[in-house]
A protein has these predicted regions:
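Secondary-structure capping and domain/repeat boundary segments
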Residues: 438-517
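Acidic, Ser/Thr
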Residues: 68-69, 381, 447, 469-477, ...
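Extracellular/surface recognition and adhesion modules
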Residues: 14, 29, 51, 339, ...
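Extracellular/surface-exposed low-complexity segments
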Residues: 1-13, 388-442, 482-484, 509-510
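Serine/threonine-rich, repeat-prone extracellular segments and beta-strand-based repeat modules
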Residues: 416-434, 486-506, 559-561, 587-591
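Short beta-strand elements of extracellular/lumenal beta-sandwich folds
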Residues: 525-536, 558
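Structural signature of tandem-repeat unit edges
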Residues: 24-32, 46-58, 71-88, 97-116, ...
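Surface-exposed interfaces of beta-sheet-rich extracellular modules
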Residues: 68, 404-415, 466-495, 570-579
Length: 599
């Protein structure tokens, strides 16, 4: 009520009042308002709580004008129906933790606006709950750094009509304004912007944010751009032109509600840092970075740390030749089951500390070209599900790897603990694959026979659940009658059962059948074919020969099969009249379908 206001001081463009009802001080400004503050205000600066500027013309720089180090208890500022064309700066103008309300509306710009910077204009206004900037012409502004930084309790902010066509920097523009629930930046012209660093940093309450029309062609810095935007469920950055971006440090860190994020078209050829780029994007189940050009990247520290929902991740095309740090790179990726880093060039890497820490679902890991870095503390800590590790011989340690039984999958060397594995790997001269667990052995005793390598024993190594391979040996004058678990041949071995225990099996042999054919035979003449044979087997010999399917070897032997059981076979030595001068008679001729049967 104006009736309670008493004038305590006044000047050409200002009046200071005291409210007799509550004892509060306020000030009104009007007319031509310069950017300087008269000394007459000094005794009231620590008392004035409200400032109203109406029908005034402001000229010059109003940087830090209403700041808390000047007006120490200021709670509200209202600028209405005033000419703001001559204002050149509002930098830190309202930078005050005591301000609760700022209204800038219905103002005039009879000439082109002079305002060039709004940096920190409302920075650190921790108590600001009401803000109207509809009367602010930003068409000439080039610097909006931290403009609304730390508007900690502000829930509503309308910047939909901002003209940002001249803005070159938006660093931390809305940073740490954690209570903002809505923010319409869909019409922002960002064609001149070079930095968007931390632009939406800590906007934890935003559930929607439309940046799909952002022109990022000139942007070089996107570090922390969406840091901890924990409420965002959707974010369309698929059209971002990132060809000029050099810094993607923490770009999406903490966006833990995003279920999808399309960065497949990102041009990362100029990016030098991807540290923590996707850190704590916990809801992401897929992330396509297969086309990333990482040839300029020097740090990938914590790049995918705590991406707990990722079930797969293709980084096989990453060029890591310039990377110096991979510490924590996949730390906490608790859903990843396989990582193929076989193409990683780690020759420049100095630290891999905790690189795979707590990748609790990781089963297979390929480190074909890794080299030993200066620091690898806890590199494999928490990889409890890891059952297969293929590692370069130039990677000399596996710090944090499960202290359990492993074995060399190629040479079948068993290690009872991590220390034995470590010592063994130090002497390798080529990449080696290791499997967790105990391997089982099948010893195959040929019992007087031989395998293809002329050995009388063959040993297979498998792990539980796999299947043994049946290998058939040979023995002069005998045919093979199967594998048995005992030397008495009473318990036949079953290859169709999965591997369960180590064991030895024995080959059973049966002496061959002997068939003697008369010296002179011909099926094309009347000469009777006679066969003399001795059957030393336990089954009836029934031999069928077909010219189209059977040939005679140089050793003059035919393989005869038992028709009742084709797995039973024997070699039939042949002899006949013939000589070098009569080669025709040295050829055994059998008509198609002809059979030889002897009981």
């Amino acid at each position: 009520d104006d009736s309670d206001l008493t004038v305590v001081s006044s000047g050409a463009y200002w009046t200071i009042y005291r409210n007799t009802a509550n004892g509060e001080y306020s000030m009104r400004m009007f007319g031509n308002v310069p950017s300087s503050r008269p000394t007459a205000w000094n005794s009231y600066l620590k008392s004035i709580k409200h400032i109203e500027i109406e029908e005034a013309t402001l000229t010059g720089s109003f940087a830090s004008y209403f700041r808390n180090n000047v007006f120490t208890v200021l709670e509200s500022v209202r600028i209405e129906r005033s000419n703001l064309s001559g204002v050149t700066s509002f930098e830190m103008a309202f930078y005050s933790p005591t301000l609760q309300k700022v209204i800038i509306r219905d103002n005039d710009y009879p000439t082109a606006p002079s305002l060039r910077t709004t940096e920190y204009m409302f920075g650190y206004t921790h108590k600001l709950t009401e803000l109207d900037v509809s009367g602010l012409d930003t068409s000439a502004v080039t610097n909006m750094n931290c403009m609304f930084n730390y508007c900690s309790v502000l829930e509503e902010l309308d910047v939909s009509n901002f003209d940002t066509s001249s803005v070159t920097t938006m660093r931390d523009m809305f940073g740490s304004s954690g209570k903002l629930e809505k923010l319409d930046v869909s019409n922002f012209d960002t064609s001149s912007v070079t930095t968007m660093q931390a632009m939406f940093y800590g906007c934890t309450s935003l559930e929607e944010l439309d940046v799909s029309n952002f022109d990022t062609n000139s942007v070089t810095n996107m570090s922390y751009m969406f840091y901890n935007c924990a409420g965002l469920e959707e974010l369309d950055v698929s059209n971002f032109d990132t060809s000029s971006v050099t810094n993607m440090y923490g770009t999406f860190v903490g966006c833990n509600s995003l279920e999808e994020l399309d960065v497949s078209n990102f041009d990362t050829s100029s990016v030098t840092t991807m540290q923590a780029m996707f850190n704590a994007c916990r809801a992401l189940e897929k992330l396509d970075v297969s086309n990333f050009d990482t040839s300029s990247v020097t740090t990938m520290q914590a790049m995918f740390e705590n991406c707990t929902g990722l079930g797969e991740l293709d980084v096989s095309n990453f060029d890591t030749s310039s990377v110096t740090t991979m510490a924590y790179m996949f730390d906490g990726c608790t859903s990843l089951e396989e990582l193929d880093l076989s193409n990683f060039d780690t020759s420049s890497v100095t630290t891999m500390a905790y690189m795979f820490q707590n990748c609790t679902a990781l089963k297979s890991l390929y480190l074909d070209n890794f080299t030993t870095p200066k620091t690898m503390t806890g590199m494999f800590t928490g990889t409890t599900a890891l059952t297969y590790l293929f590692a370069s011989h130039n990677l000399r340690a596996f710090d944090g790897l499960a202290n359990t039984r492993w074995y060399d999958e190629k040479n079948w060397v068993q290690f009872s603990n991590y220390k034995e594995l470590q010592m063994y790997h130090e002497y390798q001269r080529e990449p080696t694959g290791y499997r967790k667990g105990v391997f089982l052995s099948l010893t195959m005793d040929a019992m007087g026979g031989q395998f293809e390598d002329a050995e009388e024993q063959k040993v297979q190594n498998k792990v539980s659940g796999e299947y043994w391979e049946e290998v058939v040996p040979v023995k002069e004058g005998h045919y093979f009658d199967g594998w048995y678990l005992d030397r008495n041949f009473t318990n036949k071995f079953d290859f169709s059962l999965p591997v369960a225990v180590s064991t030895t099996i024995y080959a059973k042999w049966v002496e061959n059948y002997t068939v003697v054919i008369p010296a002179s035979i011909s099926l094309n003449e009347a000469t009777e074919l006679k066969v003399e044979g001795i059957n030393r087997g336990s089954k009836t010999l029934s031999v069928g020969l077909n010219y189209e399917e059977t040939t005679i070897s140089e050793s003059n032997k035919l393989t005869l099969s038992n028709t009742a059981d084709t797995t039973v076979q024997c070699l039939a030595p042949l002899s006949w009249d013939g000589s070098e001068t009569n080669p025709k008679n040295a050829i055994l001729t059998l008509a198609p379908g002809s059979e030889i049967t002897e009981g």
